[in-house]
């Protein structure tokens, strides 16, 4: 393909692989020097997106026969004008996916959830911002917002009925959920809490770990739990999670850690009288200049995560302060 593979899904019978791609659209494929070709607009989109249109890309899904290696395009992004495809699930032989396309006026991206029926896309939901589709207790779920740009509402787990009606899985859970997965009938999810990103057992409502870290992904194998995690002073590594503790099993950044000095943070939650502000600081000396980083939010946050800019500032002799005055997403 002339593009990139964004995601993939093994079919339930393990005979096929569904591959999500981002490729040049049909019209743009014929241009020899793609990098120098300008874009022409008759009207300016309300919001420039980075998902495809300004790069002339379209999202497709291929079905690959694992035995023969042959493939067929089952979702044609050019035909349906799909800018990108985020998540894909299979249930009872039906493919359901979340995807982006522009509205009828061409002024705004719409995120939709639809399923494939006789090579046609039947939309289930069209108003929100959703991805990370999964089935739990034989019902379709997604992580996201019911309405686009519904900030500062937290992203959460939403449940869909067959008619497309949406309800909250955890209505009273007031933290930002970023990823969910079902393993052995248990629903696990990552959520943000005051600068941390932690892993939670949704069935039992308990955290598998409570440390000042950011967990970026998780997986299960042979009864073991694995996470990709980092902290304020340590970059990403793979860890096995054992009784609430991290056991490092990868060496991806060992050389970096051995050769580059990193600094841990001082954390304070500052009460202004009207709200509480999560704040992190690196102190290198009282006679040193200070850089204040204020997060615009509320769609993201500074936190207990490895950020090379802060480490670079500190190495150059600056004190560093980073805060979330509009609220951490967790």
Language-model segments: residues:
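Structural motif
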Residues: 27-30, 58-60, 104-114, 150-158, ...
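Predominantly five- to eight-bladed beta-propeller fold
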Residues: 22-64, 100, 110-112, 156, ...
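Flexible loop/turn segments at secondary-structure boundaries
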Residues: 82, 104, 129-132, 148-150, ...
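Conserved beta-propeller blade repeats
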Residues: 2-20, 26, 48-54, 77-104, ...
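Serine-hydrolase catalytic core recognition
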Residues: 219-224, 228-330
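Short loop/turn segments that connect beta-strands within beta-propeller blades
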Residues: 65-69, 116-119, 161-164, 202-204, ...
């Amino acid at each position: 393909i002339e593009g990139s593979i964004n995601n993939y899904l093994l079919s339930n019978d393990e005979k096929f692989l569904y591959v999500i791609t981002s490729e040049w659209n049909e019209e743009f494929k014929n241009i020899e020097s793609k990098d120098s070709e300008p874009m022409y607009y008759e009207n300016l989109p309300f919001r420039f997106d980075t998902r495809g249109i300004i790069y002339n890309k379209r999202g497709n899904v291929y079905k690959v026969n694992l035995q023969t290696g042959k493939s067929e395009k089952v979702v044609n992004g050019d035909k349906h004008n799909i800018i990108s495809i985020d998540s894909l699930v299979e249930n009872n032989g039906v493919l359901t996916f979340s995807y982006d396309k522009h509205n009828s006026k061409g002024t705004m991206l719409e995120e939709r959830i639809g399923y494939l029926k006789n090579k046609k896309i039947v939309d289930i939901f069209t108003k929100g911002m959703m991805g990370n589709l999964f089935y739990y207790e034989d019902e379709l779920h997604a992580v996201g917002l019911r309405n686009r740009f519904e900030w500062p509402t937290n992203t959460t787990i939403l449940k869909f009925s067959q008619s497309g009606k949406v309800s909250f899985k955890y209505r009273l859970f007031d933290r930002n959920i970023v990823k969910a997965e079902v393993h052995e009938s248990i629903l696990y999810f990552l959520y943000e809490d005051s600068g941390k990103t932690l892993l939670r057992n949704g069935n039992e409502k308990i955290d598998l770990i409570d440390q000042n870290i950011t967990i970026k992904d998780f997986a299960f194998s042979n009864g073991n739990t694995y996470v990709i995690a980092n902290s304020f002073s340590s970059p990403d590594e793979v860890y096995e999670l054992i009784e609430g503790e991290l056991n490092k099993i990868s060496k991806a950044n060992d050389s970096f850690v051995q050769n580059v000095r990193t600094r841990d943070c001082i954390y304070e939650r500052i009460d202004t009288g009207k709200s509480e502000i999560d704040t992190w600081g690196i102190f290198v000396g009282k006679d040193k200049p200070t850089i204040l980083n204020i997060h615009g939010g509320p769609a993201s946050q500074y936190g207990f995560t490895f950020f090379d800019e802060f480490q670079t500032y500190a190495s150059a002799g600056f004190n560093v302060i980073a805060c979330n005055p509009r609220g951490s997403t967790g």
